[in-house]
Amino acid sequence: MNFETIIGLEVHVELNTNSKIFSPSSAHFGEDPNANTNVIDWSFPGVLPVMNKGVIDAGIKAALALNMDIHKEMHFDRKNYFYPDNPKAYQISQFDEPIGYNGWIDIKLEDGSTKKIRIERAHLEEDAGKNTHGTDGYSYVDLNRQGVPLIEIVSEADMRSPEEAYAYLTALKEIIQYTGISDVKMEEGSMRVDANISLRPYGQEQFGTKTELKNLNSFSNVRKGLEFEVERQAKLLRSGGAIRQETRRYDEANKGTILMRVKEGAADYRYFPEPDLPLYEIDDAWIDEMRAQLPQFPAQRRAKYEEELGLSAYDASQLTATKALSDFFETAVSLGGDAKQVSNWLQGEVAQFLNAEGKTIEEIALTPENLVEMIAIIADGTISSKMAKKVFVHLAKNGGSARAYVEKAGLVQISDPAVLVPIIHQVFADNEAAVADFKSGKRNADKAFTGFLMKATKGQANPQVAQQLLAQELQKLRD
C-alpha cells in the first residue's frame, strides 16, 4: 500500500526587540547565564507583566508579511505546565485569538512551479529558559531566554513531502528576515522548527495519526528527520501496526528519530485568559503604520530584477538571499552601476570574500559607491580586471575611493604607447634568446613576450593595448 505524506510545521521566531516581552530585561543573545534577568523573569510573588509595545508592532508586521488577517481585539492566555526552566509554572501565550490568522505564502517547487501553503495562525508568546545538565550531577537553569519574545507561526498541513517542507522554511525565513523583526539565526536559537507528520492511504480524506518532531536544528535536519519518519511510519503501517500520537526527536548521530514522550493535547495545558494583562485593541491606523514600514519582499524584487534589469532567475534568486544584499545591489544600480556587472561582482569576488571572512555584507567596509566606482575604472581602462581583485580586497577591508587608492598605490594601468613601446624594446634587448627563437619561426615563441612585458611593468600594462603593440613591434622584428 502506498501512502500520502501530510506535513505541517510550527516555527518559533525570536523577535529582535531590545527588551523582553513582559519585563525590562535585555533580550540580547550571548550574555553570561542569568545576566539578563530581573524579578519578573524570576517570577517573584506579586510582580506583574508589562507589555512591550514593540512586540505587538513586530507581530503586526509578521502577520501582514504572511498575508494574514489580524485580530483587532487581542488578548493573552496562560498555558500551564511545570518545568524547571519555567519558574511561573505557566507560559503567557495566545490560544483562541492569536494576533494573526488565515494567511499564506507561495513556495517554489523543484519543477519550477509555485504552490500556496496556508498558515493557520501566528501568535505571540514568551520563550522559556534553558536547562543545562552538568557532568557534576547537577542541572543548571539559565533564565536569560525566559521572557524573550517569540512569534509562533503554525502552517496548515499543506505540505506533501520533506522537499516541500524545506522550500516552505526557506521562503518563510526569507520573508521574516526581510521584515527586520528577527535575524532568524537557527544557530543562535532565534528560529526553531517543530514538524508534524502523518501518513494516509492515497484517496483517504481523514488525516492519519501525527507524530511531532523536535531537535531539528537546521533545515537540512528537518528534511532528514521527515524523510526518516516517512519510512518509519510506512513500514509500521504496512506491517499492520498503528501510529501513536507522540513526540520524537531527531538524532543527528544516528540519522533517525527517538521517542521523547507521548504527545499532550491542548486540554493538558489548561489554557485560560491571562488575568494580569488587558485586552489590546489594534486599530487600522496602527496596522497602516506598520504596513508602511515593510519593504518590498523577495518575490517582487526577483520579478523586478528579471523583467526590468534583464537578470536570470538564478541571479535574481542569489541577489535576494538577504535584504542587506538586495539593498546593496539596488543602491549600486541606482548609482549607475551596470546590473549584470554588479551582480557578477556580488556573486563572485564579494561572496568569496564574505565566506572566507565569515561575515555579512553589512560587516565589511565595501559600499555600493565603492563598487560602482571600481567597475567604472575597470571599464575606462584605469585598472585591469585582474588588478581589480586586489583593489576590491582593499576596499572590502578599508573602504574609501577606488580611484584614489589605485592612484596612491601606483596600480593605474599603462595604456600610453609612448610609454609601452620603449619598454617593449627593452624587453627585446633583455631577452635575446627569445628574440632569436621568434625570428627562426619557433612555434609560440611570440607568447613569451607577453609575460616578459607584464613582468617588466609589474602587471600594470593594459593587456589589450600591450597585445596590439607587441604584435606591431614583433612584426617589425620579422620584417
From Swiss-Prot:
SUPFAM superfamilies reported in the protein's UniProt record: GatB/YqeY motif, Glutamine synthetase/guanido kinase
InterPro entries, A to Z: Asn/Gln-tRNA_amidoTrfase_suB/E (IPR017959), Asn/Gln-tRNA_Trfase_suB/E_cat (IPR006075), Asn/Gln_amidotransferase (IPR018027), Asn/Gln_tRNA_amidoTrase-B-like (IPR003789), GatB (IPR004413), GatB_C_1 (IPR042114), GatB_Yqey_C_2 (IPR023168), Gln-tRNA_amidoTrfase_suB_CS (IPR017958)
Keywords from the UniProt entry: ATP-binding, Ligase, Nucleotide-binding, Protein biosynthesis
EC number: 6.3.5.-
Signal sequence, renumbered to the chain: none
Name of the top EC class for this enzyme: ligase
Reaction catalysis annotation: L-glutamyl-tRNA(Gln) + L-glutamine + ATP + H2O = L-glutaminyl-tRNA(Gln) + L-glutamate + ADP + phosphate + H(+); L-aspartyl-tRNA(Asn) + L-glutamine + ATP + H2O = L-asparaginyl-tRNA(Asn) + L-glutamate + ADP + phosphate + 2 H(+)
GO MF term set: asparaginyl-tRNA synthase (glutamine-hydrolyzing) activity; ATP binding; glutaminyl-tRNA synthase (glutamine-hydrolyzing) activity
Cited Gene3D superfamilies: 1.10.10.410, GatB domain, N-terminal subdomain
Example GO BP: glutaminyl-tRNAGln biosynthesis via transamidation
A Pfam family recorded for this sequence: GatB_N
Similarity remark: Belongs to the GatB/GatE family. GatB subfamily.
Quaternary structure (record): Heterotrimer of A, B and C subunits.
Role description: Allows the formation of correctly charged Asn-tRNA(Asn) or Gln-tRNA(Gln) through the transamidation of misacylated Asp-tRNA(Asn) or Glu-tRNA(Gln) in organisms which lack either or both of asparaginyl-tRNA or glutaminyl-tRNA synthetases. The reaction takes place in the presence of glutamine and ATP through an activated phospho-Asp-tRNA(Asn) or phospho-Glu-tRNA(Gln).
NCBIfam families per record: gatB, PRK05477.1-1, PRK05477.1-2, PRK05477.1-4
PANTHER family recorded: GLUTAMYL-TRNA GLN AMIDOTRANSFERASE SUBUNIT B MITOCHONDRIAL AND PROKARYOTIC PET112-RELATED, GLUTAMYL-TRNA(GLN) AMIDOTRANSFERASE SUBUNIT B, MITOCHONDRIAL
Protein's recorded name: Aspartyl/glutamyl-tRNA(Asn/Gln) amidotransferase subunit B
Annotated source species: Streptococcus pyogenes serotype M49 (strain NZ131)
Primary gene name: gatB
